[in-house]
UniProtKB/Swiss-Prot annotation:
This is Phosphoribosylformylglycinamidine synthase. GO terms for cellular component: cytoplasm. CDD domains: GATase1_FGAR_AT (cd01740), PurL_repeat1 (cd02203). One of its GO terms (molecular function) is metal ion binding. Keywords: ATP-binding, Cytoplasm, Glutamine amidotransferase, Ligase, Magnesium, Metal-binding, Nucleotide-binding, Purine biosynthesis. Monomer. It is an enzyme of class 6 (ligase). InterPro entries: Class_I_gatase-like, FGAR-AT_N, FGAR-AT_PurM_N-like, PurL_large, PurL_linker, PurM-like_C_dom, PurM-like_C_sf, PurM-like_N_sf. The gene is purL. It comes from Escherichia coli (strain UTI89 / UPEC).
Length: 1295
């Protein structure tokens, strides 16, 4: 039976206004829109009155419910029947944890009530199209129609393909029907294999074969034999990549054989809790570094949010499934798309060439995709610290003559680093009889065909199959699985995981055969033991679906009870679905139908399928030199600063958490003005050291339209000039991931790919001492469609994205582009040696040209010398600022440095050649360094020692003020105010934020950027930052216990424990499941801290599901009430913990006036480094800090304080319960965005109780307790940041 329960309003006023404006633009007479959430409960038994009241209370979250009966035509948008939304999975979990076992499933829709003039059926279809994502949602016209969401179908049996009766044609038909993308020789191979077995294949076997042997999974092109211009080539592409490892194996521990590569890290204190006692402590051991970069291009073109989200999620799983289990740490993300054509902000180079119906626009991808990727990383608890963004779409005369080149099939890049224990780097052995386990969520009928689908050019497969390729994301589930993996590797030698792989393309049909085959075993499986939420799925759908957030593991049979215990504690679902066999055979039994859908020798599936040969021709580009007529430097500057590749990326940065883990030493945002221009990302290796890891990206795809090899060399060169900004040491410490994107089969591109791989793998990397131990290829970068009567194709340029990773010697020595105005000199190191080529530059692109000669690596020895010289200068602390030259050239390098330093530039380019345009806009490799004037001679001497004397040019100095002036020989070449340039550079991000977020907030942020008087972030402390007020109490040896409380989805508990640990506490890991099961109580604790993250993915209001699981459980409710009423206890709630505790007001004495915390005014997750002021309040944790003003990490989507009315706010203020407020850079309490990131009245962001014993706050002091983890800080701070005082105050209070 289904019950319907009304929910809160679903859209804010500005969202409704945006919809109305869109309808108006489409000439649809829509007058009013009201939207509210509607909940549907599928019940297995009726609820009594108390249970019904409990369910109603559970589903009461967010803004107050509307009291009126909605008017207008109903359009009900729900998830597509046959799918289960991530919201449903998490909300159902909460209902069960609150004791409502009668609820089979909760689901949520949005009911739109629309009052409109007379609309035709076709116009109503336009209206419904605007209101839902056809790939993931459906529209009903009555609330009762939602019954279809819970319809169950009978299981269907496996289907056989009549090969023996119909011969080869049966396989050809199945290939088309199932979208298998099998090549002719593979069809021959299967015909031969099954004829020899003497039986017909089942559909599931063919599907499994297609997934396991797709280009996506088998990399046939990279392993192929090559004939170019009639000449047999000596090596495959993959062999040339492996050559880098053969020449430079230094520091690599694992390459080419696992889900990620591993290199040597540093010996540090890894901080985690003991399995038996729950007590956190440091464990001195090597933290080796793993690295992986994936792409998720096809799903992102179809449905950008889930496409990018599952792209990030899959890459995170690759890291966790490395060796015998590892810890993902920090992420990077990247996008290449066609032109944005932002409405009202179209640029002169952006022509509309049309697109296929089945894919979305570049603007849609960049509106939704980055949000999906960021949301997954945020909810999982991984900071996203690095990225790139390129737009390209043009009709150009390239290798194949004049044609359309661009990214209708986008690149969505997801990568990152993690850490792994030394003894877990290599996978273990799978014993015969080992249990084969699926860890993670249930099978669902989604993402079918992803591996094969992404191996086809968009437009080759059936549109319905594209629907089937869409996936769905549940990062909170992945976090639970990762917590299990963490518990396993933390056990050291007792780790129950023998072998682990993630489940990705092809689902279990790819993952399980890979697992047993890699372990040298076969496997026998039971289909019906696989967890499934949809009983009507066929065997093919159960075995081959790509439901995300799953891992496959081999666990020794005697270790299963331990593994079961770990999973139950973390509430991570798992199922034992088979066991390893001696015989290399794969069998899958179906208990329901008592048959064998799969019964195959492993070598049929994974054996020597036919090897591909690529017989291709070389084509050379004949570009025309750049036509200069009508190009002025002033116009060029504005155009180039508007090009999204160059323009400010704030809209892509502040949506992503950049402080979680407490180990982020360098994020994108630089300096007191928080400008997104960092050269590279840097993390600390642990919470107790200055060793670290660095990541940087290099990418110059448009150059490939002129010169394939140069484009590849420049990608490596740019990654190197980016990562050089931190202290690494020997270049052999740097390892690269190479991600290759090409339109295989397009004239000239295959030979170009070979040329590019050879340039990097056989020549450049070996010469530099660089290794490429990991990478990926995507070989179908083309879209085809019909535009009117014309057949069109959009082919991406050959695109190599290089991600560089390295161990860092001292994270404190990372140099940023932030200029200083002390007596200084700016030096350009021009590795282009005066070539100043303008082919395929940003300048060429904004004038709709390609040019003829591009930049290149001009001298490999000098590139190596450059890296070594910069490393020497970093170690000697001779550099004040550093920024590489890249897209937009020297002009953009100097501008970005000036933006970061909020200063002027007085530059002279006389020594850079007579062609001023080329001097300013060429994109040859190089960098601008800022040094003290007194150090200039010594710095130039170091550069000369490294063979760079002929590359160094003095180009002026940074000056105070707002003028950006470039001269040559006394003549002004360009002059503008820095503020004007800053505003031009920011306009793309402003327009994107206006479209995507609350336009009022976007306008406020843009306005703030034009304020030259803004002093930037600054610090005023009312206490001595270096005084340790806890020291006398620590000296007694007593370590009071703090319960570090977490719920499923919480992700900030480790850094919280570390902060309390440093202040003299014993931090104990306490999971809500421990309290609910009675394994642990709160009576033995002096302090309770509820940590940040996304409990239950924030589905029933941030922190509200967590709070209700306490309030609706009598024993646990009493446990909390007793703790809060006990004198001499302290409690702290941060972020999600703050939201949760604000919902426990009925249990906490003196908290009656506390507000609720609701959706930010921007309607967006906000990750900022915000200035706050400590106000006079009873808070015991903030004693002695009153009046201090200092920055703090902020990361939340629902942090806005909501009070009932003005009287409530006045009472909260007059009682003095406000503990922290947001202030602007002038020190004034503010409600202006983004200084106030959530729109809270009077800047309120922390409150306390009347006794001061319980304090709750939205910002994260635990993420910045170390100076090094602050995005910016005064140079005189030592090891401890000012927020360490909170934790020491806690220790002092307990005496």
């Amino acid at each position: 039976m289904m019950e319907i329960l009304r929910g809160s309003p679903a859209l804010s006023a500005f969202r409704i206004n945006k919809l109305l404006a869109r309808f108006q633009a489409a000439r649809l007479l829509v007058h009013t829109i009201y939207a509210e959430y509607v909940h549907f409960a599928d019940l297995n038994a009726p609820l009594n009155d108390d249970e019904h009241a409990q369910l109603e209370r559970l589903l009461k979250y967010g803004p107050a419910l509307a009291s009126h009966a909605p008017q207008g035509k109903l359009l009900l948008v729900t998830p597509r029947p046959g799918t289960i939304s991530p919201w449903s999975s998490k909300a159902t979990d909460i209902a069960h944890n609150c004791g409502l076992q009668q609820v089979n499933r909760l689901e949520r829709g949005v009911a739109y009530y629309i009052e409109a003039g007379t609309l035709t059926n076709e116009q109503w279809q336009q209206v419904t199209a605007e209101l839902h994502d056809r790939m993931m949602e459906t529209v009903f016209f009555a609330l009762d129609d939602a019954e279809q969401l819970f319809a169950h179908h009978q299981p269907t049996p496996v289907t056989s393909v009549d090969l023996l009766g119909q011969g080869r044609q049966a396989l050809i038909d199945a290939n088309l029907r199932l979208g298998l993308a099998l090549a002719e020789d593979e069809i021959d191979y299967l015909q031969d294999a099954f004829t020899r077995l003497g039986r017909n294949p089942n559909d599931i076997e063919l599907y499994m074969f297609a997934q396991a042997n797709s280009e996506h999974c088998r990399h046939k092109i990279f392993n192929a034999d090559w004939v170019i211009d009639g000449e047999q080539q000596p090596k495959s592409l993959f062999k040339m990549i492996k050559n880098t490892f053969e020449t430079t194996p230094d520091h690599v521990l694992s390459a080419y054989k696992d889900n990620a590569a591993v290199m040597e890290g540093s010996e540090v204190g890894r901080y985690f809790a003991d399995h038996e006692t729950g007590r956190y402590d440091f464990h001195q051991e090597p933290a080796h570094i793993l690295m992986k970069v994936e792409t998720h291009n096809h799903p992102t073109a179809i449905s950008p949010w889930p496409g990018a989200a599952t792209g990030s999620g899959g890459e995170i799983r690759d890291e966790g499934a490395t060796g015998r289990g590892a810890k993902p740490k920090a992420g990077l993300v990247g996008f290449s798309v066609s032109n944005l054509r932002i409405p009202g902000f179209e640029q002169p180079w952006e022509e509309d060439f049309g697109k296929p119906e089945r894919i979305v626009t570049a603007l849609d991808i960049m509106t939704e995709g980055p949000l999906g990727g960021a949301a997954f990383n945020n909810e999982f608890g991984r900071p996203a610290l690095n990225g790139y963004f390129r737009t390209y779409e043009e009709k150009v005369n390239s290798h194949n003559g004049e044609e359309l080149r661009g990214y209708h099939k986008p690149i969505m890049l997801a990568g990152g680093i993690g850490n792994i224990r030394a003894d877990h780097v290599q996978k273990g052995e799978i014993n015969v009889g080992a249990k084969l386990v699926v860890l993670g969520g249930p099978a669902m009928n989604i993402g079918l065909g992803g591996g094969a689908a992404s191996s086809m050019a968009s437009g080759q497969s059936d549109a319905d199959l594209d629907f089937a390729s869409v996936q769905r994301d549940n990062p909170e589930m992945e976090r639970r699985c990762q917590e299990v993996i963490d518990r396993c590797w933390q056990l050291g030698d007792a780790n129950p995981i023998l072998f682990i792989h993630d489940v990705g393309a092809g689902g279990l049909s790819n993952a399980m055969p890979e697992l047993v085959s890699d372990g040298g075993r076969g496997g026998k499986f039971e289909l019906r033991d696989i967890l499934s939420d949809e009983p009507g799925m066929s065997p093919l759908e159960i075995w081959c679906n790509e439901s995300q957030e799953r891992y496959v593991l081999a666990v020794a049979a005697d270790q299963l009870p331990l593994f079961d215990e770990l999973c139950k504690r973390e509430r991570a679902p798992y199922a034992v679905i088979g066991e390893a066999t001696e015989e290399l055979h794969l069998s899958l039994h179906d208990r329901h139908f008592d048959n064998q859908p799969i019964d195959l020798p492993l070598d049929v599936l994974l054996g020597k399928t036919p090897k591909m040969t690529r017989d291709v021709q070389t084509l050379k580009a004949k570009g025309d030199a750049l036509a200069r007529e009508g190009i002025t430097i002033a116009d060029a500057v504005k155009r180039v600063l508007h090009l999204p590749t160059v323009a400010e990326k704030t809209f892509l940065v502040t949506i992503g958490d950049r402080s979680v883990t407490g180990m982020v030493a360098r994020d994108q945002m630089v300096g007191p003005w928080q400008v997104p221009v960092a050269n590279c990302a840097v993390t600390t290796a642990s919470l107790d050291s200055y060793y670290g890891e660095a990541m940087a990206i290099g990418e110059r795809a448009p150059v490939a339209l002129l010169d394939f090899a140069a484009s590849a060399r420049l990608a490596v060169g740019e990654a190197l000039t980016n990562i050089a900004a931190t202290q690494i040491g020997d270049i052999k410490r740097i390892k690269l991931s190479a991600n290759w994107m090409a339109a295989a089969g397009h004239p000239g591109e295959d030979a170009g790919l070979y040329e590019a791989v050879k340039a990097v793998g056989e020549e450049l990397c070996p010469a530099l001492g660089l290794t490429i131990p990991v990478g990926k290829d995507s070989m179908s970068m083309k879209t085809r469609w019909q535009e009117g009567n014309e057949e069109r194709e959009m082919t991406s340029p050959l695109s190599l994205v290089i991600s560089a990773f390295a161990r860092v010697e001292d994270v404190r020595h990372t140099i940023t582009p932030q200029l200083s105005t002390e007596d200084n000199a700016l030096l350009l190191i021009d590795l282009g040696k005066g070539n100043n080529a303008l082919g395929a530059t940003a300048l060429a692109q904004v004038y709709r040209q390609l040019g003829d000669k591009p930049a290149d690596v001009r001298d490999v020895a000098q590139l190596k010398g450059f890296y070594d010289a910069i490393q020497a200068l970093v170690a000697q602390r001779k550099l004040l600022a550093y920024h590489d030259r890249s897209d937009g050239g020297l002009l953009v390098t100097l501008a970005e440095m000036a933006f970061a330093g909020h200063c002027g530039i007085d530059a002279d380019i006389a020594t850079l050649g007579d062609d001023r345009l080329a001097a300013l806009f060429n994109e040859e490799l190089g960098a601008v360094i800022q040094v003290r004037a007194a150090d200039r001679e010594a710095v130039e001497a170091v550069l000369a020692q490294h063979g760079l004397a002929d590359c160094v040019h003095y180009v002026g100095q940074a000056v105070s003020g707002d003028r950006f002036v470039i001269t040559a020989n006394g003549q002004t070449v360009f002059s503008e105010s820095r503020t004007t340039l800053r505003v031009w550079w920011a306009e793309t991000t402003w327009q994107m934020q206006r479209l995507r977020d609350n336009p009022e907030c976007a306008d406020q942020e843009h306005q703030a950027k034009s304020n030259d008087a803004d002093p930037g972030l600054n610090v005023k402390l009312s206490f001595d930052i270096n005084e340790d007020v806890a020291a006398p109490f620590i000296a007694t040896g007593a370590r009071p216990k703090v319960a570090v409380l977490r719920e499923q989805g919480v992700n900030s508990h480790v850094e919280m424990a570390a902060a309390f640990h440093r202040a003299g506490f014993d931090a104990i890991d306490v999971h809500m499941s421990d309290l609910l099961a009675g394994r642990t109580g709160l009576e033995g604790f002096h302090v309770l801290v509820a940590c940040g993250g996304f409990s239950y993915g924030d589905v029933l209001g941030a922190g509200e599901g967590w709070a209700k699981s306490i309030l609706f459980n009598d024993r646990v409710r009493d446990e909390f009430a007793t703790f809060f009423h006990r004198p001499q206890t302290l409690a702290l709630g941060v972020c999600n913990g703050c939201q949760m505790m604000s919902n426990l007001r009925e249990l906490i004495p003196g908290s009656e006036l506390w507000p609720r915390f609701v959706r930010n005014t921007s309607d967006r997750f906000e990750a900022r480094f915000s200035l706050v002021e400590v106000t006079q309040s009873p808070s015991l944790l903030l004693q002695g800090m009153v009046g201090s003003q200092m920055p703090i990490a902020v990361s939340h989507g629902e942090g806005r304080v909501e009070v009932r009315d003005a009287a409530h706010l006045a009472a909260l203020e007059s009682k003095g319960l406000v503990a922290l407020r947001y202030v602007d850079n002038f020190g004034k309490v503010t409600e202006t965005y983004p200084a106030n990131p959530n729109g809270s009245p009077n800047g309120i962001t922390a409150v306390t109780t009347e006794s001061g014993r319980v304090t709750i706050m939205m910002p994260h002091p635990e993420r910045v307790f170390r100076t090094v983890s602050n995005s910016w800080h005064p140079e005189n701070w030592g090891e401890d940041g000012p927020w360490m005082r909170i934790f020491r105050n806690a220790r002092k209070q307990l005496g």
